[in-house]
Swiss-Prot record:
HAMAP family: CCA_bact_type1 (MF_01261), CCA_bact_type2 (MF_01262). One of its GO terms (biological process) is RNA repair. InterPro entries: CCA_bact, HD/PDEase_dom, HD_domain, NT_sf, PolA_pol_head_dom, PolyA_RNA-bd, tRNA_CCA-adding_enzyme. The gene is cca. It catalyses: a tRNA precursor + 2 CTP + ATP = a tRNA with a 3' CCA end + 3 diphosphate; a tRNA with a 3' CCA end + 2 CTP + ATP = a tRNA with a 3' CCACCA end + 3 diphosphate. Mg(2+) binds at residues 21, 23. The keyword ATP-binding applies. It comes from Paraburkholderia phymatum (strain DSM 17167 / CIP 108236 / LMG 21445 / STM815) (Burkholderia phymatum). Belongs to the tRNA nucleotidyltransferase/poly(A) polymerase family. Bacterial CCA-adding enzyme type 1 subfamily. Magnesium is required for nucleotidyltransferase activity. Nickel for phosphatase activity. Residues 232-333 form the HD domain. CDD domains: HDc, NT_ClassII-CCAase. Monomer. Can also form homodimers and oligomers. This is Multifunctional CCA protein. Catalyzes the addition and repair of the essential 3'-terminal CCA sequence in tRNAs without using a nucleic acid template. Adds these three nucleotides in the order of C, C, and A to the tRNA nucleotide-73, using CTP and ATP as substrates and producing inorganic pyrophosphate. tRNA 3'-terminal CCA addition is required both for tRNA processing and repair. Also involved in tRNA surveillance by mediating tandem CCA addition to generate a CCACCA at the 3' terminus of unstable tRNAs. While stable tRNAs receive only 3'-terminal CCA, unstable tRNAs are marked with CCACCA and rapidly degraded.
Amino acid sequence: MNIYAVGGAIRDELLGMPVQDRDYVVVGATPEQMIAQGFRPVGKDFPVFLHPDTQEEYALARTERKTSAGYHGFQFFYAPDVTLEDDLARRDLTINAMAREVTPDGALIGPVIDPFNGREDLEHRVFRHVSDAFLEDPVRILRVARFSARFADFSVAPETLALMRKMVEAGEVDALVPERVWQEVSRGLMEKKPSRMFEVLRDCGALARVLPEIDALYGVPQRADYHPEVDTGVHVMMVVDHAAAQNYALAVRFAALTHDLGKATTPEDVLPRHIGHEGRSVDLLKPLCERLRVPNECRDLALLVAREHGNIHRVMETKAAGLVRLFERSDALRKPARFAEALQACEADARGRLGFEANAYPQAERLRQALVAARAVDAGAVAKSYENSPAEIKDAVHRERVRAVAKALNEAPSGQA
């Protein structure tokens, strides 16, 4: 029995990056031998075991064969005579198909085992498939795109990109289940440069299949005085990358990605203006979230930002009454943390423009100050003073909040948005 650390741990070690998790492959063992040594079986489709002390996963060396469409359609084969190279050959990219032997307690020993020249591809910053078996698993398209967001200076080998395009044309991507698409897209959004993920998906044609709403934004012009980058798709990628650079949460990054969906459906005769695109964005975003089964937290923030980002951008001219109405529409009085995330997405939107990247965004501070004042109003006390006129309570609380906001901003309470 020989044990090897494989995959990402070896890749990251060679890149000088911290190794978060290790995957282990066991060669020359049977399930019975693993159990006899105290390992606990947990795998459903193939033998995976938890180490009795570290609880790390150890898998028996295996090969796989495609049996049907999609990423579930595989049959696995494992036996003591399956070699390490057999196991590495089924992996997606050469940079993930390297190994090092380890001792039973997990200490690395011996040289890097690299049968597919992954080390050379690491040095040249290239994503290259191990074999034509890459064609059999459409998730690998999403993984290459996600790795591109993590390792932004890597390129996809031309022959690998050609395989990815072939898979898209064959409809393999269409067999992906929504949860897996969301899993990979959300992980890519949390990488250093998410725009690279969407660039790779677009290059191979997969973006139009998995996120047609994003693909449709490319080539849609915007007013050059507001958007020197002009292309809406380029703008959205700048917004997402800004959100990533600020280390914002996933919900903020997803809102940044989807805030301008409605610009793709702007009538051509009114371009490059996009009047009413906020409402159209909401209409497109709802079915997108349903289709990908986006978590409620991400969906709700994205809908809020899509609907209100234009109003938030204009708040420097908005009076106290309009600010309070914005808070009421956005449920900011009950959910200030979510509203704070909406401001992050809007700031990313404002800065995700060519030449605007370092500009101040005073709208955020104005709204934060106003929200503190509005939330400080004791709605219960106001309600008590109107206990004989309950129908008037809502308007009375609103008026008190307007007065409080106006005072905080040193403005008159009258005025509209």
